[in-house]
Amino acid sequence: TSDHVQPMGKGEHGHGIMRKCRPWPYEELVHVPLLMHIPGMEGGKRIKSFVQNVDLAPTMLDALDLFGEGMDSGYGFPVFGTEDMQGQSLLPLIRGEVDKIRDFVIAGYYGMSWSIITEDYSYIHWILKDASHLDYTSTENPGKETMENEAMWSCTAGAKQEVPDSDDLYDRRTDRFQLNNIINEQPEKATELLRMLKLHIGELKTM
């Protein structure tokens, strides 16, 4: 798994070629396996649980026994402790002390999309359609209007990045490749997940 790559296959996911020309937060892009080796801990485990990249730093500090509390530096600015981090240590999960540390995860493509993923559902909120709102639901992408259009199965360098007209809701239990948008069939679930997403982003104070 790497950053600059495109999904392989025969197009069975139905979302076109991706790379950097489309802000798709679909499963084939955001579901990234995490491999860890921690000296002194038994290996060979496969754990099915939600984690995020922000969990890496607290995990490493925990493994090095460097967890610490915030304090006053004595120079007029605070020294932040590990409890101030957005992430959580994965060691309790690795040791089998807990079954999960998160009920959901979020993903996104700067200025274009946010998504929230639970065990059963995946909700995608497309941002550019809300570009007139100056809040966390929108961020302009400079130069996007000058980019040239392209077909779904091409990936022209510098192509205009467009998003769907409405948000997406997928049932992860029955729709592995996220091809059947059920947002009109389950509007209550969509509203619930969008609310969870907004609350979480608001807590992060993220733009």
Question: What are the residue ranges of the model-derived segments?
Answer:
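Generic structural signal for small/hydrophobic residues in well-ordered secondary structure
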Residues: D3, P33-L34, L56, L90, ...
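Short, P/G- and charge-enriched loop/turn segments at secondary-structure junctions
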Residues: I17-P25, I101-D103, M152-G158
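C-terminal, low-complexity/hydrophilic appendages and adjacent surface loops
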Residues: E27, G108-I183
